[in-house]
Amino acid sequence: MKIVIVALPGSGKTTILNFVKQKLPDVKIVNYGDVMLEIAKKRFGIQHRDEMRKKIPVDEYRKVQEEAAEYIASLTGDVIIDTHASIKIGGGYYPGLPDRIISKLKPDVILLLEYDPKVILERRKKDPDRFRDLESEEEIEMHQQANRYYAFAAANAGESTVHVLNFRGKPESRPFEHAEVAAEYIVNLILRTRQKS
């Protein structure tokens, strides 16, 4: 099974996938941005993922995206791809999963995670290692809406199912509750598919 997990930066995808890995150690987890960074380091001398969208011309960025997709598509077994449905570039939104990419990846599921914008802002403040753009709550919500549209468009092109985990209006009763719920959802998706095989 191939699952693409998409959410805004600061949504906790890495934490979720660490929980998945604890329960299903044989699942391959690949971060699309990390694969792109390795390619961009060699070609453009980029040092940080957050520099890619600012320093690489869009036509070259597309080539890096495609090369990363080809590598990820070659992975076998259960694979979870950590990426973004849309990327903020030049004041607009660029598709993270355009047709030419999603048709190479061919995921079974695109899992979209959504949160209260305040939650995302707080998580971003706790992650000083990243060089993220500052966004207001309104901008974060607009970006989440863009993600939803892009996720469904990608699912159409990739003939994938979209699953939405919406944590808006659901405050955590304990630390990492949302991450645990999302991880359990992913684990169950994979286990159900394995049982059918």
Curated annotation (Swiss-Prot):
It holds the Pfam family AAA_17. It is found in: Cytoplasm. Its EC number is 2.7.4.3. The keyword ATP-binding applies. Its main location: cytoplasm. It catalyses: AMP + ATP = 2 ADP. One of its GO terms (cellular component) is cytoplasm. One of its GO terms (molecular function) is adenylate kinase activity. Keywords: ATP-binding, Cytoplasm, Kinase, Nucleotide-binding, Transferase. HAMAP family: Adenylate_kinase_AdkA (MF_00234). Belongs to the archaeal adenylate kinase family. NCBIfam families: PRK04040.1. This is Adenylate kinase. It comes from Pyrobaculum aerophilum (strain ATCC 51768 / DSM 7523 / JCM 9630 / CIP 104966 / NBRC 100827 / IM2). The gene is adkA.
